[in-house]
Amino acid sequence: KATRGHCFLLFTSYSALNYLFNSLKNYFPKEDYTLIKQNDHPRHEMIRLFKTSKNPVLFGTDSFWEGVDVQGNQLKMVMITKLPFKVPSDPVTEAIIENIKKNGQNAFIEYQVPQAVIKFKQGIGRLIRSKTDTGNIIILDNRVIKKRYGSYFLKTLPKNIVIDKRKELIKIIK
């Protein structure tokens, strides 16, 4: 609510998206906010709704991490709910991981982290589309500060501010 909508919430799974959407939909009055959930509309319609609606909040998965251009004050915040690691059981990912392991390398550090960092960078790139764009990035996944590999993600941020307290966060956003 601090940014009056104008926010993308990016998810790595539909189950998490649906859970949070259903948990939050009554928190945002319909007359004040437009909640847009992936699969309720085609992608192009969701983007159009986001650009033209009052105080929009978009809940999206994979296809909204990249290739969406919303410039200026239309998008003020990108919230990343979880670091975008590929599902290791995906057949292509699984084959790549096995090949890396066969060569005696650490597949997590050599492949999975770099791929997730690229996707992460694409996700936060939704916010800054031109030299004059500004906004807030909120990362809900505490692995960026608790795990050693988190520094790879934090290094991609334009300005790195880590805040633990809700009141501090709201003050900065406003």
Where would I find each of the regions flagged by the language model?
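ASCE RecA-like P-loop NTPase motor cores
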Residues: 1-174
